[in-house]
């Protein structure tokens, strides 16, 4: 995320510089929470989180080159947004299952359901962030209802898939 901040600042891509700064603040908050509450997140969860973050910031930051349109790979590759939402929510689902699962006195189904709800709620917060950015600051159009509903769908699907994969019995 820090590389995206530097690259977007260098290229004068103010839209994605703003997104990257918010992402950097969010990442710093997660690191502080991890340290304060001693979550000890597993390495594979951290790597799983790194992939969609890198895809998101790289994909959008390419718009600074003015080669792939205003929103970089999000406009050049129509499926990019769906994939990033699926993988990002999948990482959130894994984190929720990891953190909440041992504390629940319920089975795998309840853990997967709750983790999917957490991932979907985080995805909803992203959609509200995009809407507020568009409404208050005139950022780029996010695709209206179709884009928002598809994002919410892939958030739920990714959150479910991540939690389901994380909680599956290991052989």
Question: What feature does the model see in each segment?
Answer:
Residues 1-90, 94:
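"…centered on the first transmembrane helix and the immediately adjacent amphipathic helix/loop
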Residues 91, 115-122, 127:
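Alpha-helical transmembrane segments of helical membrane proteins, especially in multi-pass transport
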Residues 102-120:
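Internal alpha-helical transmembrane segments of multi-pass membrane proteins
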Residues 43, 71-72, 111-114, 137-138:
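Short hydrophobic/aromatic segments of transmembrane alpha-helices and their interfaces
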Residues 7, 34, 55, 59, ...:
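Membrane-water interface at transmembrane helix exits
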Residues 87-104, 135-140, 156-169:
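Membrane-interfacial alpha-helical segments at the cytosolic side of multi-pass membrane proteins
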Residues 63-73, 80-81, 124-160:
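Interfacial helix-loop-helix junctions of multi-pass membrane proteins
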Residues 45-47, 112-117, 149-153:
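Hydrophobic alpha-helical transmembrane segments
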């Amino acid at each position: 995320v820090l590389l995206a901040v530097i690259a977007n600042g260098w290229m004068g891509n103010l839209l994605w510089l703003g997104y990257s700064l918010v992402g950097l603040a969010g990442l710093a908050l997660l690191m502080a929470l991890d340290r304060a509450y001693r979550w000890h997140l597993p390495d594979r969860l951290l790597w799983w989180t790194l992939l969609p973050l890198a895809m998101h910031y790289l994909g959008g930051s390419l718009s600074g080159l003015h080669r792939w349109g205003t929103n970089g790979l999000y406009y050049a590759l129509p499926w990019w947004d769906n994939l990033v939402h699926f993988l990002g929510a999948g990482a959130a689902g894994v984190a929720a299952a990891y953190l909440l699962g041992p504390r629940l006195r319920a089975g795998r189904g309840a853990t997967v359901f709750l983790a999917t709800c957490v991932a979907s709620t985080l995805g909803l917060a992203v959609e509200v962030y995009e809407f507020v950015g568009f409404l208050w600051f005139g950022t780029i159009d996010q695709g209206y209802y179709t884009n928002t509903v598809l994002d919410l769908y892939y958030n739920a699907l990714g959150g479910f898939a991540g939690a389901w994969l994380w909680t599956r019995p290991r052989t």
